[in-house]
C-alpha cells in the first residue's frame, strides 16, 4: 500500500499524511473510470493536506487529476472562493455532463448571480440536495452550491463593478436562493389526486353555472357523465335533475308550439273553406236566377205559339208548318 502511494508524485509523502491515509481501508472505495480525453484536462494539483478536523465528502483514494476533492469545512481554515468554484464546476462535469448540457462557465455565472439559474441547473439542484442528504454528518447545513453566497458577496464587486449597488440593495443570496433550491425537494408538484380534488373544489360553487341550458339539453348522457367526473354525488344528481326539467320543459314547449301551429293551420283552412262556400253559394244563386229567367221565357214562348197555331192553322208562316 505504501508502494502504491509512493508511486504518485503528486501525493504528499510526510509521515503525518501517510499515517492519516493508512487509517482508511482504501480497497473498499470504488475508483471511477474516466475517458482519456477527460483525464488529460488540466486540474488543480492536490498539494494541500486536509487537516484532521475537516470533513470531506470525496474519498481520498480518488485520483486528484480526474476528480478534485470536495470543499472541506474547518473552523481554523478559510479556503479560497476560486477553489470552491473550480470544485463545483469540475464536480458537475464528473457527475453527468451529457444530461445537463451545461458548461463550467454557466455554473460559475449562476453562482455569481449575474443572471437567473437556467432550467438544467435546477435539475442539478435536486441532485445536489440528494447528495447532501446522503452525507448528513456534515456539521453545518449548506445550500446546493457551496460557497455561492460568499462568492456572490466578495467576488461580485471585484469581478463585476457595475453590479456593486445591485448586490448591496438585494437581500443575501443564500436566503434568496434557498426557496428556489428547496423547491424541487421540499415542495413536490401536485399529484393526479390533488389535481382532481382541486378541479372538483373549483367547480363546487358553480357546477350548475358551468353548463348552459342549451348545452345540458343538447348534450348526450355519456358526454355529460364524462364532464361530471370529480364532482360529488349530490351535485351530479342535482345537475341531472335540472337537465330532465329542462328537457321536459322543452318538450312541453315543443308540443305547445306544434299545437299552436296546427291551430293556426286549421283556422286558415277553415277561413279558406268558408270563402269557397260563400263563392259557391253566390254561384248557386246566380244559376238559380238564370234558371228562373229561362223558365219564364220558355213559358211565354209556349203560350204565344199556341195562340198563333189556333188562329192561323193553314198559314205557311206558322212554326208548325216547318215542323
Swiss-Prot record:
Residues 34-78, 116-210 are annotated as: Disordered. Residues 238-263 are annotated as: Basic motif. Its main location: nucleus. Residues 266-287 are annotated as: Leucine-zipper. SUPFAM superfamilies: A DNA-binding domain in eukaryotic transcription factors, Leucine zipper domain. Residues 238-301 form the bZIP domain. Keywords: Activator, Disease variant, DNA-binding, Isopeptide bond, Nucleus, Proto-oncogene, Repressor, Transcription, Transcription regulation, Tumor suppressor, Ubl conjugation. Residues 34-43 have a biased composition (Basic and acidic residues). GO terms for cellular component: chromatin; nucleus; RNA polymerase II transcription regulator complex. There is a cross-link at residues 32, 297 (Glycyl lysine isopeptide (Lys-Gly) (interchain with G-Cter in SUMO)). GO terms for molecular function: DNA-binding transcription activator activity, RNA polymerase II-specific; DNA-binding transcription factor activity, RNA polymerase II-specific; identical protein binding; protein-containing complex binding; RNA polymerase II cis-regulatory region sequence-specific DNA binding; sequence-specific DNA binding. It is found in: Nucleus. Residues 54-76, 192-201 have a biased composition (Low complexity). Ubiquitous. GO terms for biological process: abducens nerve formation; brain segmentation; cornified envelope assembly; fat cell differentiation; in utero embryonic development; inner ear morphogenesis; integrated stress response signaling; keratinocyte differentiation. Residues 129-143, 159-168 have a biased composition (Basic residues). Phosphorylated by GSK3 and MAPK13 on serine and threonine residues. It is linked to Multicentric carpotarsal osteolysis syndrome: A rare skeletal disorder, usually presenting in early childhood with a clinical picture mimicking juvenile rheumatoid arthritis. Progressive destruction of the carpal and tarsal bone usually occurs and other bones may also be involved. Chronic renal failure is a frequent component of the syndrome. Intellectual disability and minor facial anomalies have been noted in some patients. Duane retraction syndrome 3 with or without deafness: A form of Duane retraction syndrome, a congenital eye movement disorder characterized by a failure of cranial nerve VI (the abducens nerve) to develop normally, resulting in restriction or absence of abduction, adduction or both, narrowing of the palpebral fissure, and retraction of the globe on attempted adduction. Undiagnosed in children, it can lead to amblyopia, a permanent uncorrectable loss of vision. Some DURS3 patients manifest sensorineural hearing loss. The leucine-zipper domain is involved in the interaction with LRPICD. Homodimer or heterodimer with other bHLH-Zip transcription factors. Binds DNA as a homodimer or a heterodimer. Forms homodimers and heterodimers with FOS, FOSB and FOSL2, but not with JUN proteins (JUN, JUNB and JUND). Interacts with PAX6; the interaction is direct. Interacts with ETS1 and LRP1. Interacts with the intracellular cytoplasmic domain of LRP1 (LRPICD); the interaction results in a moderate reduction of MAFB transcriptional potential. Belongs to the bZIP family. Maf subfamily. Acts as a transcriptional activator or repressor. Plays a pivotal role in regulating lineage-specific hematopoiesis by repressing ETS1-mediated transcription of erythroid-specific genes in myeloid cells. Required for monocytic, macrophage, osteoclast, podocyte and islet beta cell differentiation. Involved in renal tubule survival and F4/80 maturation. Activates the insulin and glucagon promoters. Together with PAX6, transactivates weakly the glucagon gene promoter through the G1 element. SUMO modification controls its transcriptional activity and ability to specify macrophage fate. This is Transcription factor MafB. It comes from Homo sapiens.
Amino acid at each position: 500500500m505504501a508502494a502504491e502511494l509512493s508511486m504518485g508524485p503528486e501525493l504528499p509523502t510526510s509521515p503525518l499524511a501517510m499515517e492519516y491515509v493508512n487509517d482508511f481501508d482504501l480497497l473498499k472505495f470504488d475508483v471511477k473510470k474516466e475517458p482519456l480525453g477527460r483525464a488529460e484536462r488540466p486540474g488543480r494539483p492536490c498539494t494541500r493536506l486536509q487537516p484532521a478536523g475537516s470533513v470531506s465528502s470525496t474519498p481520498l483514494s480518488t485520483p486528484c487529476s480526474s476528480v478534485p476533492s470536495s470543499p472541506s469545512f474547518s473552523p481554523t481554515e478559510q479556503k479560497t472562493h476560486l477553489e470552491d468554484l473550480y470544485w463545483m464546476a469540475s464536480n458537475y462535469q464528473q457527475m453527468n455532463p451529457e444530461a445537463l448540457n451545461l458548461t463550467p462557465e454557466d455554473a460559475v455565472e449562476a453562482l455569481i448571480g449575474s443572471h437567473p439559474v437556467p432550467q438544467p441547473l435546477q435539475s442539478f439542484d435536486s441532485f445536489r440536495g440528494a447528495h447532501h442528504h446522503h452525507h448528513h454528518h456534515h456539521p453545518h447545513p449548506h445550500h446546493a452550491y457551496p460557497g455561492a453566497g460568499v462568492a456572490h458577496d466578495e467576488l461580485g464587486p471585484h469581478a463585476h463593478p457595475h453590479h456593486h449597488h445591485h448586490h448591496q440593495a438585494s437581500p443575501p443570496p443564500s436566503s434568496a436562493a434557498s426557496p428556489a433550491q428547496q423547491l424541487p425537494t421540499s415542495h413536490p408538484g401536485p399529484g393526479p389526486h390533488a389535481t382532481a380534488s382541486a378541479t372538483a373544489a373549483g367547480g363546487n360553487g358553480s357546477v350548475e353555472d358551468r353548463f348552459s341550458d342549451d348545452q345540458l339539453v343538447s348534450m348526450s348522457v355519456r358526454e355529460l357523465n364524462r364532464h361530471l367526473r370529480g364532482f360529488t354525488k349530490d351535485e351530479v344528481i342535482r345537475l341531472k335533475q335540472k337537465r330532465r326539467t329542462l328537457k321536459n320543459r322543452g318538450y312541453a314547449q315543443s308540443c305547445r308550439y306544434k299545437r299552436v301551429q296546427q291551430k293556426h293551420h286549421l283556422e286558415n283552412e277553415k277561413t279558406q273553406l268558408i270563402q269557397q262556400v260563400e263563392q259557391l253559394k253566390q254561384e248557386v244563386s246566380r244559376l238559380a236566377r238564370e234558371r228562373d229567367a229561362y223558365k219564364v221565357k220558355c213559358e211565354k214562348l209556349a203560350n204565344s205559339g199556341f195562340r198563333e197555331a189556333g188562329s192561323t192553322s193553314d198559314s205557311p208562316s206558322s212554326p208548325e208548318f216547318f215542323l
